From Swiss-Prot:
Name of the protein this chain belongs to: Large ribosomal subunit protein bL33
Region described as Disordered: 17-40
GO biological process, one term: translation
UniProt keyword ATP-binding, yes or no: no
Gene Ontology CC: cytoplasm; ribonucleoprotein complex; ribosome
GO molecular function, one term: structural constituent of ribosome
Lineage: Bacteria, Bacillati, Cyanobacteriota, Cyanophyceae, Synechococcales
Domain of life: Bacteria
Species per Swiss-Prot/TrEMBL record: Prochlorococcus marinus (strain NATL1A)
This protein's encoding gene: rpmG
NCBIfam families in the record: PRK00504.1 (NF001764), PRK00595.1 (NF001860), rpmG_bact (TIGR01023)
Family membership: Belongs to the bacterial ribosomal protein bL33 family.
Pfam family, one: Ribosomal_L33
UniProt keywords, alphabetically: Ribonucleoprotein, Ribosomal protein
């Protein structure tokens, strides 16, 4: 029998969108992406640099619970 999968789906949220006032953003809201990570290789929270359409620039996106 196959083992339980080690890959889980995680949500990444922009860290800068919350601190910027809505007058400086293109639209109201927070940028979020979904991706998969391997639980065995990456035990800590995932951080990736992704494009934030709200701020129209590349920002750090952190894994949220």
């Amino acid at each position: 029998m196959a083992k339980k999968g080690t890959r889980i789906v995680v949500t990444l949220e922009c860290t800068e969108s919350r601190s910027v006032p809505s007058s400086e953003k293109r639209s109201a809201g927070v940028s979020r992406y979904t991706t998969e990570k391997n639980r065995r290789n990456t035990t800590e929270r995932l951080e990736l640099k992704k494009f934030c359409p709200e701020l129209n620039k590349m920002t750090i996106h952190r894994e949220i619970k």
